Design a protein with these regions (language model features):
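Residue-level signal for well-ordered, solvent-exposed loop/turn and beta-edge residues enriched
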Residues: 29, 85, 102-103
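Short beta-strand segments enriched in hydrophobic/aromatic residues
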Residues: 24, 77-79, 111
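Short beta-strand edge/turn micro-motifs at domain boundaries
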Residues: 90-125
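Short acidic-aromatic low-complexity motifs
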Residues: 1-26
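Hydrophobic/aromatic beta-strand elements that line small-molecule binding cavities or substrate pockets
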Residues: 44, 57-63, 77, 90-97
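Short, well-ordered beta-strand segments in beta-rich or mixed alpha/beta enzyme
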Residues: 70-77
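Short, cysteine-centered beta-strand-loop-beta hairpins and adjacent loop/turn segments enriched
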Residues: 53, 78-88
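A solvent-exposed, acidic/Ser-Thr-rich amphipathic alpha-helical stretch
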Residues: 17-70
Length: 125
C-alpha cells in the first residue's frame, strides 16, 4: 500500500491525472473538504488547473494493522497558484484500497480549509 500512496502523491504533485487514475479501481474518487467528491481524474485536473507549482513533503505513511485495507498519508502541501499566491498547509489523506486488486478505491482528504479558502477563494477555473 505504501508504494501506491507515494506514487499517487507524486502524480498529484506533478499534476498528472492519468498517472494518478492508473492507481485506482474504475470509478475511484477523491473527497476534498474544499472541492467535494470528484473522480480522481477530475480532482487532479482541477488542482493542476489552478496550480503553477506544488511540493509535497511527506511526514509519514501509516498502514492499517487490521480490518479494511487502509493507509493514511500525512504531509505538508506547499502550493503555488497561477496568480502567484502561495499557501502551505498540513494534510492527512485516508486511502481505502480494494482487497482483491490492491488498487486505491478512494481517498478522503482531511485538512483545515480556513487558510486554504483565504488564499484560493474561487481561483479554480
Amino acid at each position: 500500500m505504501q508504494p501506491a500512496v507515494h506514487k499517487y502523491l507524486s502524480a498529484l504533485e506533478a499534476g498528472d491525472a492519468e498517472r494518478a487514475a492508473s492507481l485506482f479501481v474504475p470509478g475511484g474518487w477523491v473527497q476534498s473538504p474544499f472541492l467535494g467528491r470528484l473522480s480522481v481524474r477530475d480532482y487532479v485536473n482541477k488542482v493542476a488547473s489552478a496550480s503553477s507549482k506544488a511540493h509535497l513533503t511527506v511526514y509519514d505513511v501509516l498502514v492499517s494493522a487490521e480490518g479494511h485495507l487502509r493507509a493514511v498519508a500525512y504531509y505538508q502541501y506547499d502550493w503555488s497558484l497561477k496568480d502567484g499566491s502561495n499557501v502551505t498547509f498540513d494534510c492527512a489523506d485516508v486511502f481505502n484500497f480494494d482487497s482483491d486488486t490492491g488498487r486505491i478505491e478512494s481517498i478522503v482528504l482531511v485538512y483545515d480549509t480556513d487558510p486554504v479558502r483565504a488564499v484560493v477563494q474561487n481561483k479554480y477555473p
